[in-house]
């Protein structure tokens, strides 16, 4: 971790191609849909990745094996809505709450396709254990780390 609390080297991730997470009333509970996460984590390790992204039944990205995903494009912050099948994570909720009181960090919920991911300026993953983790690379795309660090600082001040 660097002095701002985010990971210094950045994560290397990719999209797990072999399973889709269904969207249903249990989608937001990780324990009810754990098999795609386990398979994706094994695949990530076999491919020397830090994490893998999970696709939903519509081939859109919903989250990673252990975290919610956020992306930044043109200084706007986005995350998939819960109806895309992502886990209702504690840190995701905190960042959305922070966004309601801090206009510098407004977050919009939007679908995340593979194309949108590869056009993003920044990507970060969040969970309650590891906090905010900057994604450095997905496939051949290299991401910046500026706004994500500011969000970590703002979040750290609320704790």
Model-found features: residue ranges?
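Helix-start/capping segments and mature chain N-termini
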Residues: 1-159
């Amino acid at each position: 971790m660097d002095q701002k609390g985010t990971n210094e080297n950045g994560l290397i991730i990719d999209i797990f191609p072999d399973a889709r997470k269904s969207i249903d009333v249990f989608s937001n509970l990780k324990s009810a849909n754990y098999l795609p996460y386990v398979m994706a984590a094994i695949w990530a390790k076999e491919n020397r990745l830090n994490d893998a992204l999970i696709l939903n039944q519509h081939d859109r990205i919903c989250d990673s094996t252990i975290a919610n995903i956020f992306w930044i494009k043109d200084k706007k912050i986005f995350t998939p809505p819960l109806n895309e099948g992502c886990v209702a994570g504690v840190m995701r909720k905190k960042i959305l709450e922070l966004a309601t009181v801090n206009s510098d960090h407004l977050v919009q919920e939007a679908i995340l396709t593979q194309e949108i991911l590869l056009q993003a300026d920044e990507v970060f993953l969040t969970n309650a254990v590891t906090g905010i983790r900057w994604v450095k690379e997905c496939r051949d795309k290299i991401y910046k780390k500026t706004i994500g660090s500011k969000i970590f600082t703002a979040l750290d001040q609320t704790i």
